[in-house]
Design a protein with these regions (language model features):
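Mid-domain Rossmann-like dinucleotide-binding core that forms the NAD(H)/NADP(H) cofactor-binding site
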Residues: 125-199
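Short, glycine/polar-rich helix-capping loops at beta-to-alpha or helix-loop-helix junctions
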Residues: 100-101, 178-185, 250-255
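Glycine-rich phosphate-binding loop and adjacent beta-alpha segment
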Residues: 225-294, 326-328
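NAD(P)H dinucleotide-binding glycine-rich loop of Rossmann-like/cofactor-binding domains
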Residues: 80, 90-153
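Short glycine-centered segments of the SAM/dcSAM-binding site in methyltransferase folds
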Residues: 86, 148, 172, 238-239, ...
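C-terminal capping/lid region of NAD(P)-dependent oxidoreductase domains
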Residues: 291-300, 308-328
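Glycine-rich beta-strand-centered segment in the early N-terminal region that forms part
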Residues: 22-40, 51-93
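Short amphipathic alpha-helix with an adjacent loop that forms part of the alpha/beta core around
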Residues: 201-213
């Protein structure tokens, strides 16, 4: 089969290669999926660049955790009725070397989720990390019905789904965005208000947008940079759920202030989510796909031969929405 691989760390153009490699073998609890689309996420780019020094200890890596395709074979413990299913895949390149940037993948059957008939393979490849991370951020600390939620970076991959999860389940959601185009994208999916986080003291605008009431929940894309702003507008007993702190990866925490707020700080990464949380997310994702209640954005698509461009555009931080690699 044809696959993108890397066997050393470095820039996308330098280390990503297209090669013909052996087709995957199948274990009893696995399925083999003929992939149509592979989703590129920031975590994939960081892995390729060398964020995890032991990643290549067992040989080359086929990148990417998210994807979509059609099941073409099943292991002995999987019903043959699954052959022919259109599926979305998550957590493919986690604690293993082989991800979705290939023509075929063997993967635990529980990680290949049947797509509703009304949902395209393109949409399926967008779901794993962004939609599941957003779901965990919104729901990990209980019902959001009637709650006030602030989502920073609402036009981003995770933030876009976080706004939708909050609104679909009865919350008031205010978002931040850095330009008029992103602001409109947030409003189009239901945000009750949007403020510009590039402005000085933007948290005051966020408070005004919520009629002066502080927030119950925060879903935050840049924890370290935003903390000095966001703490001022969070309620006592509130929760901050954050999935990234790229600009300030080692933030200092005002411990006493946070303690006296009875603040819950939740760090979210999809790989570490409890299985129940993953299953809850999958159930809600498929239900809302079936009812056409989730919106998705594909920003760019590239052929497998141009996979390096997909990594580079993620690194440039110049686009919003999903980046896909076309396999078929």
């Amino acid at each position: 089969m044809k696959a993108a691989i890397f066997d050393k760390f470095g820039s996308a153009q330098e280390v990503l290669k297209i090669q013909n490699i052996e087709d995957p073998k199948i274990n009893d609890n696995e399925v083999i999926v003929k992939l149509s689309k592979s989703g590129v996420n920031p975590s994939d780019v960081k892995k390729r660049a060398g964020a995890f020094s032991n990643l290549l200890d067992n040989g080359f890596v086929i990148p990417h955790s998210d994807g979509a395709g059609i099941i073409v074979d099943v292991g002995n413990e999987v019903s043959r009725d699954r052959i022919g299913e259109r599926v979305w895949i998550y957590q493919a390149q986690y604690e293993r070397n082989y991800g979705t940037a290939a023509e075929l993948i063997s993967i635990d059957s529980s990680r290949a989720i049947k797509l509703p008939d009304n949902t395209s393979l393109e949409t399926g490849a967008c779901l794993g990390i962004p939609a599941m991370t957003a779901h965990r951020c919104i729901f990990a600390d209980g019902s959001v019905k009637g709650k006030n939620i602030l989502v920073t970076g609402g036009a981003g991959r995770v933030g876009y789904y976080a706004i939708q999860w909050g609104k679909l389940f009865g919350a008031r959601v205010i978002s931040t965005a850095s330009n008029d185009h992103d602001k409109q994208a947030c409003l189009d999916i239901g945000a009750d208000g949007v403020v510009n986080h590039r402005e000085e003291d933007w948290e005051l605008s966020a408070l005004d947008e919520n009629n002066g009431e502080k927030y119950d929940r925060l879903v935050d894309v840049e924890f370290g940079v935003n903390l000095e702003h966001t703490l001022n507008i969070m309620k006592t007993g509130s929760t901050i759920a954050t999935y990234s702190s790229t600009q300030n990866p080692n933030p200092e925490l005002p411990f006493l202030k946070m303690m006296y707020m009875d603040l819950t700080l939740r760090l979210v990464i999809v790989y570490a989510m409890p299985e129940k949380a993953k299953n809850d997310a999958i159930k809600d994702i498929n239900n809302k796909l079936s009812s056409n209640d989730l919106s998705h954005r594909v920003a760019k698509s590239y052929d497998l031969n141009d996979i390096a461009k997909g990594h580079e555009i993620i690194e440039s931080n110049s686009i919003r929405g999903c980046v896909l690699i076309n396999i078929d």
